Amino acid sequence: ASSAAAAXAPSTPLA
C-alpha cells in the first residue's frame, strides 16, 4: 500500500 493509505491507520500498518 502507498504511504497515503497507511496514514489513515491509527498505528503502523504492520501492527
Curated annotation (Swiss-Prot):
It is found in: Mitochondrion; Mitochondrion inner membrane. F-type ATPases have 2 components, CF(1) - the catalytic core - and CF(0) - the membrane proton channel. CF(1) has five subunits: alpha(3), beta(3), gamma(1), delta(1), epsilon(1). CF(0) has three main subunits: a, b and c. This is ATP synthase subunit beta, mitochondrial. It catalyses: ATP + H2O + 4 H(+)(in) = ADP + phosphate + 5 H(+)(out). Its main location: mitochondrion. GO terms for molecular function: ATP binding. GO terms for biological process: ATP biosynthetic process; proton transmembrane transport. Keywords: ATP synthesis, ATP-binding, CF(1), Hydrogen ion transport, Ion transport, Membrane, Mitochondrion, Mitochondrion inner membrane, Nucleotide-binding, Translocase, Transport. Its EC number is 7.1.2.2. Mitochondrial membrane ATP synthase (F(1)F(0) ATP synthase or Complex V) produces ATP from ADP in the presence of a proton gradient across the membrane which is generated by electron transport complexes of the respiratory chain. F-type ATPases consist of two structural domains, F(1) - containing the extramembraneous catalytic core, and F(0) - containing the membrane proton channel, linked together by a central stalk and a peripheral stalk. During catalysis, ATP synthesis in the catalytic domain of F(1) is coupled via a rotary mechanism of the central stalk subunits to proton translocation. Belongs to the ATPase alpha/beta chains family. Coiled coil: none annotated. GO terms for cellular component: mitochondrial inner membrane; proton-transporting ATP synthase complex.
